[in-house]
Amino acid sequence: MKYVKAFVSEISWDCSWYCSAMQERRNEDRQKEEEERILQANNRRFNSLFEYPDNSIKTSKYGFFNFLPMNLFEQFQRLANAYFLILLFLQLVPQISSLAWYTTVIPLIVVLSITGVKDAIDDVKRHRSDQQINNRSVSILVNGRVEEIKWRNVQVGDIIKLENNHPVTADMLLLSSSEPYGLTYIETADLDGETNLKVKQAISVTSAMEDNLELLSSFNGEVRCDPPNNKLDKFSGTLSYLGNTYLLNHERLLLRGCVIRNTDWCYGLVVYTGQDTKLMQNSGRSTFKRTHIDHLMNVLVVWIFMFLGGMCFLLSIGHGIWENSRGYYFQAFLPWKHYITSSATSSALIFWSYFIVLNTMVPISLYVSVEIIRLGNSYYINWDRKMFYAPKNMPAQARTTTLNEELGQVQYVFSDKTGTLTENVMIFNKCSINGKTYGYSYDDNGEYVPKSPKDKVDFSYNHLADPKFSFYDKTLVEAVKSEDPLVYLFFLCLSLCHTVMSEEKVEGELVYQAQSPDEGALVTATRNFGFVFCSRTPETITVIEMGKIRVYRLLAILDFSNERKRMSVIVRTPEDRVMLFCKGADTIIYELLHPSCASLSEVTMDHLDDFASEGLRTLMVAYRELDKAYFQTWIKKHGEAWLTLENRERKLALVYEEIERDLMLLGATAIEDKLQRGVPETIVTLSKAKIKIWVLTGDKQETAVNIAYSCRIFKDEMDGVFMVEGTDRETVLEELRTARKKMKPESLLESDPINMYLARKPKMPFKSLDEVANGNYGLVISGYSLAYALEGSLEFELLRTACMCKGVVCCRMTPLQKAQVVDLVKRYKKVVTLAIGDGANDISMIKAAHIGVGISNQEGMQATLSSDFSFCQFHFLQRLLLVHGRLSYNRMCKFLSYFFYKNFAFTLVHFWYAFFNGFSAQTVYDIWFITFYNLIYTSLPVLGLSLFEKDVNETWSLCYPELYEPGQHNLYFNKKEFVKCLLHGIYNSFVLFFVPMGTVFNSERNDGKDISDFQSFSLLVQTTLIGVMTMQIALRTTSWTMINHTFTWGSLGLYFCILILLCSDGLCLRYPSIFNFLGVARNSLSQPQIWLCLILSTILCMIPLIGYNFLRPLLWPINADKVLNRIHFCLKHPIPTQVQTKIKHPSLRRSAYAFSHKQGFGALITSGKTLKSSALAKSKRFL
């Protein structure tokens, strides 16, 4: 039977998947044929010959004309719907039809209509989201003038114009820009998660055209380049123009998903559009997501089919035996039909007749009821005011209505870093200068007090201060004003030692272009404290120091590298002193200090430990005054190393080390890589709920690790954090095995051969068993090492090692690698996964996970459009999972348990009745009762239970994350629970048949007339059944609302109203062939034994459920039962107000600004390519 699930999973695919797969197949076929892309600028006619796709994106499933056939085709993929369609055809065969055709048609039409309307509403929302992106405007060059067109209409070969802060419309070749040398600054946070500005440069032949529309319009260059691919950092091709050929690489290409920054305008030639862009190539395949409960229901429906077939077979055999033993006595007045020649023939026909009679074993309203429940729970998410983000006026949004209960079963969360855990904001928080810390708030008595707005330093005395900058320690301002020499050197170092460039976008307004966000924060801080970096040239740096312009001659920039983890500048002061200023990682600078700084360095290191314990990013600042003669000797060595062709970088590093020694320590800085509000608390809470969190980011390793410590994914109390940094397969394998051996020495070094064989067959029902480590560990792996670890032979090693860790950080990842990691856990762990991110680079993992969550940000909506749920802040995730997810799962499980039970109890009465009617496929109930049972009589109470049930207050759900655990292990509804429902239904059907049978057998009314007729018996059974079902739903409800009362007791009352109507003289006399229970209700319900039967049957049916609910928590309790008992005890006291406890960060890890810096930017500065005119003239304008 374990293979049936896999079989049913294969069956449950839908047409949207099929259509999208066919479209992707056509795209793949076209790309295989396209070995080289060829296009001409400004020549749509030529480019149209290649049938390149347009620039639109599509996430919707249906169109206006194909909605009805596609939606019906999709709905009939569900086994139950297909079953009832087949059943309808069977009912049209008179030889076997035992029920009227409308008993199936009416419910089937209602079910299909409700689901169709819901699907249509969902798809309209997707259409609107697509239009929001596709209908954005962009400027395009047409016949020598700039025109506005929609994004969807952009074609390959068009020349488009982008301005500052505009998103890039399509992958395009940069032609020219407003910046010198055709440079353009871009932000790629949506692609790789990095907030650093990056520089792209146009080739010289096109950058000379600048914004000359005549030249750009006449440009007819031909580009030959790679066909569409998903490699973000790879692009090669040639540009043929005016008889010359120019080489192209990825430095010339602007990718869709980037945002233009600090560049007034730029022009680009569109190379890839729509689905061909590298962003969309990395977005992964769209799949129709179904929950684990959906797959389980398909398996259970197959079980029901098998059980139904078995019963029909037994009943048909019983019919054959009965016909041979007793049936011939009845043939005198009820002869066989002409098409029945023997008892075997009759048995064969009876098989199908019972197949129709017992059809309610497969509940026709199951799927539509599930959809209604999911829709209702989705609205709870949309309406949740506690997930509403007021600054952006954005509520949480359930973008799909099919995954709500899956939110209550998540075991792995895969999170992006930039923009998801962090706010993309770096803030100068604290510093240490000459052994004294600044940045804490103190009262008049010198006692530490929390920061408050009233303690904010007033920088109004400095007209060049950045109004957005905040600082809360006035003593630092006083130290600056008192002209303390070391404080002066500290801020002078920060204002000179950087690669920031300044720009005056509006006259008198200074704007910084920071290649590293850390540097931007530092330079902004020095600006507010009176040391204003104003401008630079290749030879000078101009600083306004406390209102005075000072020009420093730039002698050398000792550039950053990953190995050096520091940078230095050498300048000549106006007083003709040669000074070296250096800043970098504390562990590096510490080794370069002069021995006289020993005591100061120890104090500063203590301060750095304090800063790091708060999760701040730290670095050290130092200087050295150089002897002029020594410097002249050194600069010659530097020049020789610079001109070397072989091992230039190595030789430059040695020259740098020669002069970066005997440094004098100035102090240290602490920058807050600002986490979103509540991130550490959320992660701690989710960890208590046994949810593992992996960070998948494109950012650098040190930055990612630092954030992992800040948000409590990694903790100091861990037994170790393993770094997998291998650059070849063997090294990566060895590092993974070494880590696993340390975590669990008895763990097999060699993977189980059987598991390895099954691992290569993902379609097999295979699950990797959990291995528990002997301690708490973390794992860090880079994208380069991940490329080897994700190979077929190593991926299982990676999975085993990573899943033994409490936290995992994967850095320097491509979007495709993110999806591969998520898929790896999905395939082998068989758990529910959730991916959360905010950028276009997160789309692939959002699509790959069972549940995709998009963080809505100001820059882009790509991740949100591809997500299943969206909101604005990461800390809303705990509410989404622990409140909405848990409740949705609990409600769905209660619904399914009751739904299957009530259908079994209802249907199996026919089984017992067969033994008393000669196995003739006659029904116990009135035909209208069969039609209305699932649609009217029992639908509203169970919907009320499924939409309003709440076992505990939402505050308790957040206070006790352990309540989430049953959903992770699928304890509340599984195959075992289904069997219990079946047994419960069998028992109840037995009671519901034989107790009324005993009541009416040989019974008389008060007037002496017999009441043991079929119609009276039928009415008694169905009335008893409705009474029992009402009490069952009441017993299962723990949270009563007015709606629950109305639905539960109102449905009972509605049954009696309809019963009286159907038995009324008006209907029965006018339509006797349809309504044939004339006066039965009036006569039967007036008898006391009928009501005594109802009470007795209800008590007998309720006893097992009451006993089980009482004994199970006592004899077989789970952790959630113990927590619930604790909560029920605490309910005697007021419900606690949930307070987010401030998490302290005891981590002693420190990371420097250099980790988010890009090597080689110093050389770009000294080349002068990034610089504009007259630095001194510009500086004077700020005085």
Curated annotation (Swiss-Prot):
Any idea which positions bind ATP? 416-418, 519, 560, 583, 617, 697-699, 812, 818, 841-842
One Pfam family hit: PhoLip_ATPase_C
Q: Does the keyword rRNA processing apply?
A: no
According to the record, the segments passing through the membrane are: 96-116, 299-319, 348-368, 904-924, 927-947, 981-1001, 1014-1034, 1049-1069, 1090-1110
Keyword list (alphabetical) reads: ATP-binding, Cytoplasmic vesicle, Lipid transport, Magnesium, Membrane, Metal-binding, Nucleotide-binding, Translocase, Transmembrane, Transmembrane helix, Transport
Write out the catalysed reaction. Answer: ATP + H2O + phospholipidSide 1 = ADP + phosphate + phospholipidSide 2
Name the major location.
membrane
Q: In which tissues is it expressed?
A: Highly expressed in testis.
The cofactors required by this protein are: Mg(2+)
- What processes does the entry annotate via GO biological process terms? Golgi organization; phospholipid transport
Q: Where in the cell is it found?
A: Cytoplasmic vesicle, Secretory vesicle, Acrosome membrane
Q: Which GO terms describe its cellular component?
A: acrosomal membrane; acrosomal vesicle; membrane
Q: How does it sit in the membrane?
A: Multi-pass membrane protein
Is the keyword Phosphoprotein in the record? no
Q: Which residues bind Mg(2+)?
A: 416, 418, 838, 842
* Stretch forming the signal peptide: none
Q: Which domain of life is it from?
A: Eukaryota
| InterPro entries with a match to the protein in the record | ATPase_P-typ_cyto_dom_N (IPR023299), ATPase_P-typ_P_site (IPR018303), ATPase_P-typ_TM_dom_sf (IPR023298), ATPase_P-typ_transduc_dom_A_sf (IPR008250), HAD-like_sf (IPR036412), HAD_sf (IPR023214), P-type_ATPase_IV (IPR006539), P-type_ATPase_N (IPR032631)
Residues forming the catalytic site: 416
Q: What is its EC number?
A: 7.6.2.1
Any one GO MF term held by the record is: ATP hydrolysis activity
| Described function | P4-ATPase flippase which catalyzes the hydrolysis of ATP coupled to the transport of aminophospholipids from the outer to the inner leaflet of various membranes and ensures the maintenance of asymmetric distribution of phospholipids. Phospholipid translocation also seems to be implicated in vesicle formation and in uptake of lipid signaling molecules. May play a role in phospholid transport across membranes and in acrosome formation.
What family does the Swiss-Prot or TrEMBL record give for this protein? Belongs to the cation transport ATPase (P-type) (TC 3.A.3) family. Type IV subfamily.
Q: What is the protein's name according to its record?
A: Phospholipid-transporting ATPase FetA
The gene that this protein is the product of is Atp8b5
